[in-house]
Amino acid sequence: YYTVSSESYKAEAGAPPARKGEDQPMNIQWYPGHMTKTRRMIGENLKYVDVVAEVIDARIPIASRNPDIDDLVGSKPRVVILNRADQADPAASKQWAAYFRSKGISVLECDARSGAGVKQFSPVMRGALKEQIARWKEKGQVGRPVRAMVVGIPNVGKSTFINKVAKKKSAKAGDRPGVTRGKQWITVDQGLELLDTPGILWPKFEDETIGLHLAFTGAVRDAIMDVETLACHLILLLAQRKPEALTARFKIVPEEGMSGWDLLEAGARKRGFLISGGEVDLERMANILLDEFRAGKMGRITLELPEDLEREEDDHGTA
């Protein structure tokens, strides 16, 4: 099912114009029913694999991870695939790589669409299993293929990544979240076999920010939310994290005290998005902002850093 509720999220984008629907705060929930079955399938198939590769969006490494994965995978060797690294801030990606490695998780930065970095997948997977492979050799199991499970939430580019690795259209890729279904083993060169699983997402977001960040990148369909309110939250975050991107792309110079709605209106005026009576066309501006951010036209931007995760752990007393 798909829902958007206004019960718990206190919007920080500022006071919206007095227009129907725009004063609704956002608490995004996204959990199609087939994902319960998928989670069970992942748990049941873990015994058949040697290593788990988790594909995440390098722009939102916190929001694009499924917190259930840690419990599901347990002590299995892990590899995190920082996909769409071409759209993420390189310095931020280095911070994330260091963070995951400090947790004992191997890392691969890549862009599945162009194929950049994908060739390193097999070496990274084997590196994560170095000790296990040595034990296989001791037992005379030379040439035994590495068997891996590839997991990830919907719309992080998992199917595109698998297609690129396998050099063929094995898994059905689509732009809409939740398009990949079923189960299949995919044989990759160099003795690597992948078990493809549909992406999974938890039934309820633990933090409203998670839902927003997923929506910013398109992991949640725009049709289930108010796009103008969403764009206001994005433009406010960009003003805080990457103000120069707004200046370069929209000629906006964020000033202290400006709300998301102020910024969105300023951008609309700079682009000449006006309707009858000189009123700004906020809907058009909202869609343009989201489209250009998702397409990488605003430069390489990472919305989340390891320090955000550590701050969250401190807030919950789990550091």
How does the language model describe each region?
Residues Y9, R19-V51, R59-D68, L72-R78, ...:
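Helix-rich effector regions associated with P-loop NTPase G domains
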Residues Y1-Y2, S8-E12:
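Short terminal hydrophobic/aromatic SLiMs and anchors at protein ends
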Residues Q132-W136, N163, K169-D175, R241-L246:
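Short, structured loop/turn "capping" segments at alpha-beta junctions
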